[in-house]
Amino acid sequence: MNQVKSFKYDVLIGPEDLCNREEERKSFLSAAKKGKRVVLFAPRRYGKTSLIRNIVGLDFQKGSRKHFLLNFDLMDVRSMESIEERLHTGLTHALSSHFSPKKILAEIIGYLKGFTVQIDQNPNTGQPSVQLTSKKKEAKKNIYDYFDSIKQLSKKYKLMIVLDEFHDIAFVEGAEALFRIFLQELQDTAIFILGSKRHLLKVMFQDSNAPLFHYGDEAHLYPISVEHWLPYFQERLHPAKLKIEEAALSYLVKKMYDVPNAICEVGEWLRENVPQKTIITKTVVEQQLSDLIQRKQSFAYLLQAYSEKEKTVLKMISFFEFVKEPSSDNFLKTVRLPKSTTSHIIKKLLDVGAIEFEIEKGYRVSDPLLGYYLLDA
């Protein structure tokens, strides 16, 4: 019996839930096998982590027993101690899932010279769980030990290293230089640097004074066309005896700023809430979006974290959907704020991830559903 497919959102997805990324999947897998360095720019909730870690990474690892995937989530790191914690989490998880306890104790332990290795049983899964205890007390020195362990592993295994939300190390003094030394010492290792805060990534990789200037090959994830979304939607709506018109889907995709996670969240809402045997029109989508937004009580609490001026800028960006020049006279007249104040707010909103910048379109609210909510807030 075939399992009914739903729309997955706010979770990491596998290939069965991926919509039209086959070309990118093949290209990135080829880059991984060749030991390339890739800097992947993509807005938040575009599925870059799922694509690189869950799909390309697993494809890479299945290619050979000597292939080994290491994933490090660097989102919101603000100190050397937090970087150390993420390195510990990534390395121990990879070791626990890839190697047997016997293999770790017989061989892998030799690559972990800066640590005391302990293997416990995970109480939730019953699976072996590796724990590394640092022999030094200073976070920076421990980071060097993690880097050294990874370099030693790279001599025995073909590694694919994923550094997710890498741009946040920019908030930690000295971290960029630390990573530059580490990355340059890895010879044939595939490195995938993922990031969504383009303004930070631009400084890190395009500023001639930055430690990582011109590192890696720049890559992007582009919007998925309605042409490819349509069969994806119809397949998941069909078991609920629903069908969506192309014009309605075009409207939905546009209002969700082409963000796959938001598109799928609305898709699942439609699947669960629209009466059976309904042909979903633009009018139905508009009504269902309003109903969905009314359930989003968390948005009101989220906005309490912003000043009135910051909320004004957010609301005006959501009104225009995309703003190319927030320093333009037209936008400044709309928000009724000085240019310097507006520029400061834009920078802050970018830093905290409240807004995104897309090269061809401009600034937009990061969460499309929040943007929709702001229209009536």
Segments and roles (model prediction):
Residues M1-P43, L58-K62, G114, K155-Y157, ...:
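A short, basic N-terminal segment
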Residues N2-F7, F299-A300, Q304-A377:
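C-terminal leucine-rich, beta-strand-based interaction scaffolds used for sensing/assembly
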Residues R37, Q131-R198, Q206:
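Conserved Walker B catalytic segment
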Residues F41-Y46, S50-L159, T189:
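P-loop NTPase nucleotide-binding core
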Residues L58, W269, K348-V352:
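Alpha-helical DNA-recognition elements
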Residues R198-G216:
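Short regulatory helix/loop adjacent to the ATP-binding pocket of P-loop NTPases
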Residues D217-H228:
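Conserved AAA+ ATPase "SRH/arginine-finger" region at the nucleotide-binding site
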Residues Q234-S298, E308:
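Amphipathic alpha-helical "lid/sensor" segments that cap RecA-like P-loop NTPase cores
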